[in-house]
Every structure is written in structure tokens, then in C-alpha cells.
Design a protein with these regions (language model features):
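Core subunits and conserved enzymes of cellular information-processing
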Residues: 1-201
């Protein structure tokens, strides 16, 4: 039963992420970072489907993740990536807003929520998140901070493929997303700690 719940949680997180990406960001030329961003740029340059690139480009990262984190994480992450690839083939709605500023804010919040949920369920949606999770265990940097570090390089290079306006909006979206990832991955633990401290104080 717990495996079914985990699979549903991972699939739901991937769905949330896909909505943020395909409904808010991409239609307004604001892109994702990490391997997803690389896949979006590759799809733009070659005309090959994004869903193909997102699987192929993630394989080396998850081989590394298998060695460093384990089979359970790797399987969960591959399942999440397959869900993202599948959802992206079905979710192609008209953008909720044509305002790039609004799409940046809400898209960043939604994709951050989706990534955070997947991490809490033991998986990953992007190869750079594999490195971020390992860095979180071995360095003082949080998952969100490490992801943002990679995105500064990847999203900066997107200006050559799309436009510099798109690159700048994308950087803003990911500043919002990485804060949202931290809220989801660490916020519940911090809230539990506050409740424990408050309970002891009342006693």
C-alpha cells in the first residue's frame, strides 16, 4: 500500500510541475532550468519532442544517483521523469495569462511546489536535483540553493536560444521556485519543530 501511495504522490508532484511548466511558463517563453531547461532548448533547436530529450538527458545523472543514493531513489526518480514525459504529452492548454510577469510568479510557485512534493516522496524530477540532494547531505547548502546555482548557468545560456528577456524572467521564476522547494522540503519539518517547542513551553 505504501508503494502505491508513494507512486501516486510522485505522479501528482509531476502533474503539478507539468501544469506550471506547460500552462504558465513555456507558453510565455519563460523556461525551466536544470536538465528540463536543457531539454527545452534542445527541443527548440532540433524540433524533436521535449518528452524524448527529458528521458535521454537524465540517464547519466540517475546512473550517478544509483551509485551515490541507491536503487530506491533511482527508481522513484525515473518513475517521476516518465510521469513528466507522459503528462507533457497531454497538457497543452492555452496559457492562463499572457503577462510574462504573472506567468513567472505563478509558474515559479507551481513548479517549486511540484519539485518539492516529489523530493518529499523520495524522488527527483531533474538530474540536477540528484546532485542537489547529494550536496544537501554533504554541504551546508540546501536543495533549493544548489538547484539555483546550476540554473544560473543553464538559464543564462538560454538567452542565446530564446531571448535575453526570457532568460531574465526565467531566473526570476527560479528564484521563486527554489524558495518554494525549501518551504515544501523543509517547511513541514520546521513546523513540527515549532509545535514541539511550543508544546514543551506550555507544559
Amino acid at each position: 500500500m505504501k508503494y502505491i501511495l508513494r507512486a501516486l504522490g510522485l505522479a501528482f508532484g509531476a502533474l503539478i510541475y507539468t501544469i506550471g511548466l506547460d500552462v504558465f511558463l513555456v507558453p510565455n517563453h519563460v523556461i525551466d532550468g536544470g536538465v528540463v531547461g536543457i531539454a527545452l532548448m534542445a527541443a527548440q533547436l532540433t524540433g524533436i519532442s521535449f518528452s524524448v530529450f527529458i528521458i535521454i538527458l537524465n540517464i547519466p545523472f540517475f546512473i550517478f544517483g544509483y551509485k551515490k543514493i541507491g536503487a530506491f531513489f533511482t527508481v522513484s526518480s525515473l518513475f517521476s521523469i516518465l510521469c513528466l514525459s507522459g503528462w507533457s504529452n497531454f497538457i497543452h492548454y492555452e496559457p492562463v495569462t499572457s503577462d510574462p510577469f504573472l506567468s513567472t510568479i505563478y509558474g515559479g510557485i507551481i513548479i517549486g511546489l511540484g519539485v518539492g512534493l516529489i523530493i518529499r516522496w523520495g524522488g527527483s524530477l531533474d538530474g540536477t536535483e540528484v546532485l542537489a540532494i547529494i550536496a544537501d547531505r554533504r554541504t551546508p547548502f540546501s536543495v533549493g540553493e544548489t538547484i539555483m546555482f546550476f540554473n544560473l548557468f543553464i538559464l543564462g545560456s538560454s538567452g542565446f536560444v530564446f531571448s535575453w528577456d526570457s532568460a531574465m524572467y526565467s531566473l526570476v521564476a527560479y528564484f521563486i521556485a527554489y524558495k518554494m522547494i525549501d518551504v515544501v522540503t523543509n517547511g513541514l519539518d520546521e513546523m513540527k519543530g515549532m509545535l514541539i517547542v511550543t508544546g514543551k513551553h506550555d507544559q
